[in-house]
Amino acid sequence: MDHGVSGDLIVTDGTTEVTRFKEVIEDDSIKRIVVNVSGGTDSPLVIYFLAKFISQTKKYDKEIFPHFMVDTGNMLTIAPTLVPKQIDVIRGLFPDVTIHDVYTQDFLRKEDWHDDLQRYIPVSKEGRHFRSDLYDDVESASLDGIKNLYCEPLKKNMWEVLKPDVLLNGKTSNLPNNTLKLYGADVSQPKARAAGETEKWPQEKKDRSPWYKVDKRFIGHQYRKENLMDNLFPLTESCLVESKGELIENGLKPDAYPCKMCHQCVEKFVAFGMYDKCWTK
């Protein structure tokens, strides 16, 4: 049984098969492939397999365009410096494939920004709801952790500038709730990605998300299988905490980043045995 990548462009862990890459590679009308990236582990793996399969099939007329919408109000993230390094690693592995420089667009969630504190603050301390979370259209946001209220015009601009034939992202299904609870994450976030919910997505959304029916454990398997733990994984960042003030509000020290408590930290640890910065505890 194949526990990695089969010869027919299908990514598998021996149980679940991901076929979206095969569809994109074999569709000769698709030349310009945009991948929304976030700095985490899932989206660079999409770029990695696209590049690998383009190289494998010698379909060099296909080009990859990474697109990154940067929340400038996140005071802790170093993802804007990590993402170009992720791309360089993949370019080094597949130098014959055209992977463009990251197309970056910035935004600030003005509804959530506190001028005096110089950071984002939630509307209510208990609910941890941000004002921009309260808009109805956030439910259909195409990037997790990105507030649709401010990203919608950026996405429209991306379509006009990059003119993609197909748009992909790195969304996965969340881990099962019982697994999350074992590690202290009581709520599956975002809820639309709770285990089993992604199967209910419309086909268009599934087509944008090659990993929609797998969770982070599948991603971890591929990193190990493809020998990406030493070169690509250390360049990923997943923690959702956005400021030292938020760390303190959660009872942590101001330098306790990654927090090891948020949904993304828990999922990363379950799948990889490590948090951001390759911390193991």
Q: Could you tell me what each predicted segment is?
A:
Residues 1-281:
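Nucleotide-activated chemistry modules centered on ATP-dependent adenylation/adenylyltransferase
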